[in-house]
Amino acid sequence: MILLRNLTLARAGRPLLEGVNLSLHANQKVGVTGANGCGKSSLFALFTGDLHQEAGDLELPPRWVIAHVGQETPALATGALDFTLDGDAELRRIESDLREAEDKHDGEAIAHLHMDYGHIDGYSARARAAALLHGLGFADADFERPVAEFSGGWRVRLNLAQALMCRSDLLLLDEPTNHLD
């Protein structure tokens, strides 16, 4: 559960939220609406730990994984499919650990990491990422294209694919339909 108690949030000295009390429970779907500049993105930044409240309390479950679709996607050299796969931090950690174990010829670690990889469904990760990209309108030929080559709208779709690839407890969508081509 997410709990805000008497929470106050300000930016540049301007109060965005004052004395807010709110409880959000698991499996709830909540929309946050408001005019430009009213603090929706700042609220999300509070949830991700990028901002801190001026007063009051924010309680998030300590082990929750948060996926966030921001409004901007940097121009990266990473290919679209790999960018999407980067959304699954545990997958990427296991892959990195596996490469390291293979370099060290550590058979026991390799065996354990392959078990972990199977447990998180790592063997189907590329297919799942491809399905996400197809669902968002990407063609197979786009998978290896660098993120930097896509227009802003297509980068927003890549951000969404990356967030959906994350096995998260909380998904924050910050204007996910803005700038779509």
Model-derived regions, located:
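ABC ATP-binding cassette signature C-motif
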Residues: 1-181
